[in-house]
Amino acid sequence: MERYLPVSKKRNSSSSLEKITGSANGNGTLYSEEDTNLEENDFSWGDYLEETGTRAVPHVSFRHVEISIRSNFQPGMKLEVANKNNPDTYWVATIITTCGQLLLLRYCGYGEDRRADFWCDVIIADLHPVGWCTQNNKVLRPPDAIKDKYSDWTDFLIRELTGSRTAPANLLEGPLRGKGPIDLITVDSLIELQDSQNPFQYWIVSVTENVGGRLRLRYVGLEHTESYDRWLFYLDYRLRPIGWCQENKYRMDPPSDLYYLKLPFEWKCALEKALVLAAESPLPMEVFKDHADLQSHFFTVGMRLETLHISDPFHIYPASVTKVFNSKFFQVAIDDLRPEADKPTMLCHADSLGILPVQWCLKNGVNLAPPKGYSGQDFNWVDYHKQRQAEEAPHFCFKNAFSRGFSKNMKLEAVNPVNPGEVCVATVVSVKGRLLWLHLEGLETPMPDIIVDMDSMDIFPVGWCEANSYPLTTPYKASSKSKRKTVHFKMEKQLLSPVPIEKIPHELCLLPPQMDSPVGAINAKYCCPQLFVNHRCFSGPFLNKGRISELPQSVGPGMCVLVLKEILTLITNAAYKPGRVLRELQLVEDPEWNSQEEILKAKYGGKTYRAVVKIVRTADQVMNFCRQVCAKLECCPNLLSPVLISETCPENCSVHTKTRYTYYYGKRRRVIQSSLRVSNIETPPKSTRRRKRRKSVYVQKRRKSAIVVPAGVPAGVPAGVPEDIPAGIPEGIPASIPESIPEGIPESLPEAIPESIPKGSAQKTEQEKRETLDTARKKTGYHGPAYQTDTSAAQVPFARPRRAVTLRRNSEALKRPPVERARRVRTVPTTASSNNRVKGPLVRIVKPEDSSQSDEEKLILESNPLEWSVTDVVRFIKLTDCAPLARIFQEQDIDGQALLLLTLPTVQECMELKLGPAIKLCHQIERVKVAFYAQYAS
């Protein structure tokens, strides 16, 4: 007898869809979790997986979900599409791949050349079935780029179209245009449902709810009764189109256990009414195109097996084949040795879930529940066969088991078998063959672990409920086992000037700028194409290029919100300061977007940052959204793009470095030039008014890292730099470094350094310079080497250095070469490169003849470090004992200006170096700094 289970009402207290919008007071303020108890309402799969140290089951493990998001269009189909350069003419194109309502097309004639492939939206693109141009007197003309490739295009088309598949006309025109299979199933759609016990009996059911292809069905005639609703995935073999029963000459009767609820004429009237409605609006046959054909079975009556019954998914029982209907269906009954027992039965086919060969439990170490009425303590198949005189079902009768990516402790979403309307967070407790033992989280009444087949259509990947706007039963207080310290942004209400975005057309990826969205938009509309992280592109001042290169090459395809949220999370965690990136992402919005608010989180320095970001929901807005994000982060517009850039970026972004750039898409920056190159250009005097310091949005930090400063050195002066060094620095160092440079890199050299070295110091003797440095050590009370990085335990909190206001010095002094002295000189060999901006040796290493052997050799700069390119910096690092670290400098685009700004905390944090290598590297950097001050800072 079929068992009907009550349908629960949707929960509204622990729904994963409830977001913290943080806009209750109208100014976008986010509040701390320490003052509010939001753990139960704000469930986040990302946080939950991180806190439990678990992983999600891969999406590809859920075959039924993967099929449900497929398009009705198939790769290889032909259609006619308007030419891009001449919309009045058309040409035949081939579908390369699909993503929801987006098609990747290639004009016939390009062969295997992918350079002209382009995306289009089925909803708004000018697409037609093959033959449409002939019927409507339209011109078929090949694109200009290949028009000379063939002399006879008519003959080419005949050969190209012979034996090919054409896109169905109903998918390109009319109400079905651009819709996927699950989008075609609407509320009140009518379907025939096979009886659970009799394969030759059907009854019509009405769809009352469609949740991502999971259908809530109600029997016709019981429209006002919810108690007998059924939940089935649309791919279930029991669902058939209207007319299937009559076509195969089966019976059309309601289930026998429901027949008593209505009078016979009431059932008949309900059936006639349903058939009329089905004839008026039939369900498209495309809904059933992915239904698997049932295979023939080899079972006979009396065969023994082990089975998992649908009404008791907690145990595996011995069972027998009690009836064979035909080559497709047979009946299995759970063994019960009690006299006159009502044995539970179920209708099965060759690929039914939960039927297993004899001894399967023994081989897999699983407990086999003995039949009711069994006298022995431990069930034994050998004794049981002798008593019952029955044969085992051969192994070839059963479906082969194979791994689908499930493993212990993985997370997923699963249907509660006691309440089919409830979907819960589930944990894989055990994997045995093709069966999974799942523990359902968050249930009010504890339940034993349930057993499901890997191919069950009642299990779903992480995020499925959220993607389909359905409530998910979550673990109580799952968001936090203990109070966590989180940092939020409080954005002040202000008028922001619109950010200009330069829109550059891409021939390879043509996405529509806007699309009208009707009520009840189809699910395929929300499918995002594959997005690439082009790590070769310029990463801008916010993002760490080294970390960008370690990210996955692409994300998606999938639902827009999920794909974009994932890629934004990856980008945020690849930033120097994730908090600043989150703040920028909060400003990415457009009033014309169809967007929803999502919470992005990032961890940095032992704290959690979160921000509410608006993410577009439709595929046609993905391109514009990615460009706006890139504009806010001041990186190349192609860093995030549906197009993979393997070689040269069309934006020519490789010319930019972290400290030398002129225009970015969205924000204007001053051209940075070295004073050596602008010495002959008159410039107006710079304002000495200090820029107002931006108010920090961060809370008090833990003293994760500190700068060691000897007693007496003013705050902000790098360790080892004499106090007598002038405050001014050449114009080559910008007056304001981008705010995204990681903490620890000063925004300018400190202005607290007094000017005690005169401008003519470049012409002093080496002995006089040494005396000057000794005087500085006496003033500060510091007697170590002038360029040595102090690593003692005396620590002071890191303070953000003040901006320098006096940046100009006589540029002519910078041109004076250092005075040669009589001493032993060792010139460091360099690698010749035609691309280096600084030619010849970068440095010379000099050791005075009268010095002791323990004294370190002195560094003499042959060129101004402010002019060093990234290649020059890499050359210098390779000449030191830190040569293995040269790759990091190359990856992170560190040029001479950035090199002079590096400090020990910055090197440890941004280059992710341990203390030992970081100290060695800073030692070499300090040598360059001291030499720079002595030779060029006057």
UniProtKB/Swiss-Prot annotation:
PANTHER family: POLYCOMB GROUP PROTEIN, SCM-LIKE WITH FOUR MBT DOMAINS PROTEIN 2. Residues 765-777, 809-822 have a biased composition (Basic and acidic residues). Residues 868-931 form the SAM domain. GO terms for biological process: negative regulation of gene expression. It comes from the Eukaryota. Expressed in testis and, at much lower levels, in ovary. It comes from Mus musculus. It is found in: Nucleus. InterPro entries: Mbt, MBT_SFMBT2_rpt1, MBT_SFMBT2_rpt3, MBT_SFMBT2_rpt4, PcG_chromatin_remod_factors, SAM, SAM/pointed_sf, Scm-like-4MBT1/2_SAM. Keywords: Nucleus, Repeat, Repressor. MBT repeats lie at residues 43-143, 151-255, 265-371, 379-475. Residues 1-32, 742-836 are annotated as: Disordered. CDD domains: MBT_SFMBT2_rpt1, MBT_SFMBT2_rpt3, MBT_SFMBT2_rpt4, SAM_Scm-like-4MBT1_2. This is Scm-like with four MBT domains protein 2. Residues 13-30 have a biased composition (Polar residues). Its main location: nucleus. One of its GO terms (molecular function) is histone binding.
